[in-house]
Amino acid sequence: MDIKVVKGSITEVDADVIVNPANSRGLMGGGVAVVIKRLGGEEIEREAVEKAPIPVGSAVLTTAGKLKFKGVIHAPTMEEPAMPSSEEKVRKATRAALELADKECFKIVAIPGMGTGVGGVPKEVAARAMVEEIRKFEPKCLEKVILVDIDEEMVEAWEKVLGLR
């Protein structure tokens, strides 16, 4: 599977579906979620909350609202908003997002840094966990993962793990 690293906004990449590193309640109050909700509309959060609770290690698909994508995958890295995350939760969330994207037969999924914002997971730890899960995954439909973040340190961490730096 092709892995590409991009510095920029997840809302502007060319992908079929984007991932929101969520909480189990589906509330979109911090980090990447705020941007997705602001640009895509309240209906994204409404639908995620209706599908809650979303345990860490699972994921749900909602509308992308006004965004150009076919949907938003909400993959919790924490149970409650602003709760600390962990390397294991980042792994579970990444795996759950990939599994759902593949099950829905999307070709390209964009994933931001998982658990690195309010979750507090060090970027290098999250980058390694995410890349290892992506490399282990055996897709049926999924062809490409775009790792995208506005944070230069996150981008550098992915590039380092992938041997691009």
UniProtKB/Swiss-Prot annotation:
Disulfide bonds: none annotated. SUPFAM superfamilies: Macro domain-like (SSF52949). Residues 1-165 form the Macro domain. NCBIfam families: PRK00431.2-2. This is Uncharacterized protein aq_987. It comes from Aquifex aeolicus (strain VF5). The lineage of its organism: Bacteria, Pseudomonadati, Aquificota, Aquificia, Aquificales.
